[in-house]
Amino acid sequence: MRIYSLIDSQTLMTKGFASEVMRSPEPPKKWDIAKKKGGMRTIYHPSSKVKLIQYWLMNNVFSKLPMHNAAYAFVKNRSIKSNALLHAESKNKYYVKIDLKDFFPSIKFTDFEYAFTRYRDRIEFTTEYDKELLQLIKTICFISDSTLPIGFPTSPLIANFVARELDEKLTQKLNAIDKLNATYTRYADDIIVSTNMKGASKLILDCFKRTMKEIGPDFKINIKKFKICSASGGSIVVTGLKVCHDFHITLHRSMKDKIRLHLSLLSKGILKDEDHNKLSGYIAYAKDIDPHFYTKLNRKYFQEIKWIQNLHNKVE
């Protein structure tokens, strides 16, 4: 049985569906969106037929491939909160923030292929279908120049798998630096290294630069976003969340102000209808990230919060 027949049977599609999509896949839709700090980002959206095969690959192939414990984005039961919490619980005072430039597009199919050869035994049918499977992944999950596109549902899993080598080597090298005792996490392209060693930023950056030269993917540091921060007497922002001087996690001030403003407008009966769902999401977000802040909000805006939550439940 060819791999295409396997996909047809397991997705309950008609015979020949997968091979037909493979022969002439419908090109993805694409559009450009502006980045916050200038430039454009291209987003790709696969056709429904291609997406069906992508989900089959996610369930039967990519979900079985390992990723490093330091990876926190696109991982079940992990979030921006658990990422920030790990650094907060380490009680480290000094933070180095490193952004990987063009993270998804810097990953090529050859990078995936190289990593896949190390772990192919985890997939039950790879021995029989190796070449077919790799060709399918190249055609269905990568775009014409063999780069990993932003927007495909398969891209996050592939990216975490390919970046495993980076995470592994960086963790080993950082652990080998005497007295550094660093905590390392990666949330997609956003890397945080925290430590209690003052003045360690050069050591950490040199470690990164050496490691980048040793691995397959062409990852590059975005120097414009490189930051060194200290929690002494203040707070640090980790993946959008605030790590306070007493090491508890809370929302950024701007988000708190936005929630208060929306609740105030609701209490006065002038919150726009289209903002009701936004407020419901903000409240759920606040409750998850900082229950203490949510409790304070609830004391002041109990009726408003109850009303917006009931409205959300009716919609569901």
From Swiss-Prot:
SUPFAM superfamilies: DNA/RNA polymerases. Disruption phenotype: Bacteria no longer produce msDNA. GO terms for molecular function: metal ion binding; RNA binding; RNA-directed DNA polymerase activity. The keyword RNA-binding applies. The keyword Magnesium applies. Residues 247-316 are annotated as: Necessary and required for recognition and binding of RNA. InterPro entries: DNA/RNA_pol_sf (IPR043502), GrpII_Intron_Splice-Mob/Def (IPR051083), Rev_trsase/Diguanyl_cyclase (IPR043128), Reverse_transcriptase_msDNA (IPR000123), RT_dom (IPR000477). It catalyses: DNA(n) + a 2'-deoxyribonucleoside 5'-triphosphate = DNA(n+1) + diphosphate. It is an enzyme of class 2 (transferase). Reverse transcriptase (RT) component of antiviral defense system retron Ec73, composed of a non-coding RNA (ncRNA) followed by a ribosyltransferase/DNA-binding protein then a reverse transcriptase (RT). Expression of this retron confers protection against bacteriophages SECphi4, SECphi6, SECphi27 and P1. At multiplicity of infection (MOI) of 0.02 cultures grow normally when infected with SECphi4 without collapsing, at MOI 2 cultures enter growth stasis. Responsible for synthesis of msDNA-Ec73 (a branched molecule with RNA linked by a 2',5'-phosphodiester bond to ssDNA). Belongs to the bacterial reverse transcriptase family. This is Retron Ec73 reverse transcriptase. The gene is ret.
